[in-house]
Each structure stands twice: as structure tokens, then as C-alpha cells.
């Protein structure tokens, strides 16, 4: 299955979580310090992953992932 590629803030957090839980990876294009970066989100064996250019974040709970998506600006307000 091809990843869902979105711009930061294009989809709401629930839509992103639904895509992840259905088995899709989500690639979020975001801008940081005047350059474009891609963050890859995935869900595997009950764990959510946010693979950024500088580190890999893990979230065990759905609520934690929702908070991360909103806090980092990956999801729409």
C-alpha cells in the first residue's frame, strides 16, 4: 500500500490515526528553519512511530499519538 503523503496541517489528527491503524504509512511534509522535511508516521504491533530527520519517537497509547500530532503541528487544529 502506498503511503499517504500530506502537508502539515492538511488533515485532522483522527484522519491521520485512522490511516495509520488501517496499515498505511503517512508522510508529513513540514517546514522547519526554512527548509522542507518529511516525517514518516507508522503503526506497528500496537506502537505508533514518528520518524523525524533527527530522531524516532514512539507512542504506546493512541491518546499520546494524537497529542503528538497536534503538538508538532502535523495535524490540523
Regions of interest found by a model, annotated:
Residues 1-32:
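Negatively charged, low-complexity tracts enriched in Asp/Glu with abundant Ser/Thr
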Residues 31-54, 72:
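Short aromatic-glycine-(Arg/Gly/Cys) micro-motifs in beta-strand/loop hairpins
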Residues 53, 59-74:
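A short, charged, amphipathic alpha-helix used as a generic interaction element across diverse proteins
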Amino acid at each position: 500500500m502506498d503511503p499517504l503523503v500530506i502537508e502539515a496541517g492538511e488533515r485532522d489528527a483522527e484522519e491521520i490515526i485512522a490511516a495509520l491503524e488501517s496499515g498505511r504509512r503517512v508522510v508529513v511534509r513540514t517546514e522547519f528553519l526554512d527548509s522542507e522535511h518529511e516525517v514518516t508516521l507508522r503503526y506497528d504491533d500496537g506502537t505508533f512511530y514518528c520518524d523525524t530527520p533527527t530522531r524516532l519517537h514512539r507512542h504506546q497509547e493512541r491518546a499520546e499519538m494524537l497529542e503528538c500530532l497536534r503538538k508538532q503541528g502535523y495535524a490540523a487544529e
